From Swiss-Prot:
Its EC number is 4.1.1.65. Keywords: Cell membrane, Decarboxylase, Lipid biosynthesis, Lipid metabolism, Lyase, Membrane, Phospholipid biosynthesis, Phospholipid metabolism, Pyruvate, Zymogen. Is synthesized initially as an inactive proenzyme. Formation of the active enzyme involves a self-maturation process in which the active site pyruvoyl group is generated from an internal serine residue via an autocatalytic post-translational modification. Two non-identical subunits are generated from the proenzyme in this reaction, and the pyruvate is formed at the N-terminus of the alpha chain, which is derived from the carboxyl end of the proenzyme. The gene is psd. It catalyses: a 1,2-diacyl-sn-glycero-3-phospho-L-serine + H(+) = a 1,2-diacyl-sn-glycero-3-phosphoethanolamine + CO2. The lineage of its organism: Bacteria, Pseudomonadati, Chlamydiota, Chlamydiia, Chlamydiales. One of its GO terms (cellular component) is plasma membrane. Its main location: membrane. Pathway: Phospholipid metabolism; phosphatidylethanolamine biosynthesis; phosphatidylethanolamine from CDP-diacylglycerol: step 2/2. The keyword Lipid metabolism applies. The record marks 259-260 as: Cleavage (non-hydrolytic). This is Phosphatidylserine decarboxylase proenzyme.
Amino acid sequence: MAAREMLYVNRETGKVEQERIICSSLVKFFIETRIGRALYSVLCKNSLFSRIVGWCQRLRVTRYFIKPFVTKYRICIEESASPLHDYASFNDFFVRKLKPDARPICQGEDICVTPADGAYLVFPSMADLSLFTIKNKPFSLESFLGDPQLAHQYAQGSMAIARLAPFDYHRFHFPIAGIAEAPRRINGHLFSIHPLMLKRNFEVFTENKREITIITSKEFGEVAYVEVGALNVGSIHQTFSPGSYVKKGAEKGFFAFGGSTVVLLFQPQRIIFDADLVGYSAQGLETRCRMGQSLGKRFSS
């Protein structure tokens, strides 16, 4: 697979590194040619195509892709709960569980943790989203949430985005403790959430299928937890019990092949994001984090 490099900050080392982008030549065709853009739009709006993509990744023959993928992207297989030969397909590996101690959870009731492995951008104020535009229009929180009243609650709040790359651990977790309501689904298209695509078009967040869960917490208020699906029609899977009390770090669900973004929304004066994440985000740099690390602290006046 051809690859193009993209810069990010490794949070553990503080160094700027290069992410190898999967299928960048194909993506370049889709975004830089008229024929490619037309074909891409048709394919991603076709539910049959999305189902075929998902079905292909569940075929047993795809298990032979696992070892080369692990080697190329230097995935730490020692963290996985099962050995490589136990995975029946590439999708089985994609949704793998980790050993219980593989992702320590940052302790403290006043600390919100990162919900997934991935590349993070944080926006202490929704006004900071002005650097993202959709067809020369500001990002619409109302369109994203599909609910004007809900959007109003977060309009002056804060936002964190976690982009999961294909080589990441693809189970997502609760960043705080609290009562988690039943997810609300917003149907939409299934455009790719590829980093090169996002640089050209942030619109996928308001067009793609997504699921919204409200978590009520004493420390952080009502937090909106949004999973954004992509490519594979059945990519978002919830594993928690709606209406129940959830612990910080507990598994919430997983993305099958194709789903790849988690967005957290906080009401005003509820969280202070960690300074390193804020600083790098202001420079337009994503920060690669592991699930369970500190995202921010409860706001205190």
